UniProtKB/Swiss-Prot annotation:
Annotated GO CC locations: cytoplasm
GO molecular function, one term: phosphatase activity
Quaternary context: Monomer. Interacts with MAP3K5/ASK1; may compete with AKT1 preventing MAP3K5/ASK1 phosphorylation by AKT1.
Organism: Homo sapiens (Human)
Name of the featured protein: Dual specificity protein phosphatase 13A
Length: 188
């Protein structure tokens, strides 16, 4: 993925309200209907599963230099600073894939980690959870909103062009709140 171009979105502006959860779920059902263990969803930014994250040789082949584990200390996620050693920068987010889990508490720190990494020449970032569909996707969507200034709708469409993702409804509500906060801040 050399260049990323945003899809035509019909002149969406700051006044456009956040899509409803049902509209977001429809957007999530559209686009790519399958995913690999790991997919590049933005230049040098990958979403993947725990099996990929647990395979240091695969990470080396992909050129991954930074790992954000959205299921830190989870059952299937053995990664951590000791696992990767000094060759990979690591951030662990102990998120649970439950609608009532407050993943928004990690939006800023996760987005900042991704942003700093992608501003490092030659860096590639893997964001993963167990399956690479809900927690990791939520944090990548938050990054695209916070640092790439995409609306939630634009971020979902962009990621869905490259990977099947489906954050749980609680995470979608939290992303909607972030979208509304960012749009409100942009109107001041």
């Amino acid at each position: 993925m050399a260049e990323t171009s945003l899809p035509e979105l019909g002149g969406e502006d700051k006044a456009t309200p956040c899509p409803s959860i049902l509209e977001l779920e429809e957007l999530l059902r559209a686009g790519k209907s399958s995913c690999s263990r790991v997919d590049e969803v933005w230049p040098n930014l990958f979403i993947g599963d725990a099996a990929t994250a647990n395979n240091r040789f695969e990470l080396w082949k992909l050129g991954i230099t930074h790992v954000l584990n959205a299921a830190h200390k989870g059952l299937y996620c053995q990664g951590g600073p000791d696992f990767y050693g000094s060759s990979v920068s690591y951030l662990g987010v102990p998120a649970h894939d439950l609608p009532d889990f407050d993943i928004s508490a990690y939006f800023s720190s996760a987005a900042d980690f991704i942003h700093r990494a992608l501003n490092t020449p030659g860096a590639k970032v893997l964001v993963h959870c167990v399956v690479g569909v809900s927690r990791s996707a939520t944090l990548v969507l938050a990054y695209l909103m916070l640092h790439q200034r995409l609306s939630l709708r634009q971020a979902v469409i962009t990621v869905r062009q490259h990977r099947w993702v489906f954050p749980n409804r609680g995470f979608l509500h939290q992303l909607c709140r972030l979208d509304q906060q960012l749009r409100g801040a942009g109107q001041s």
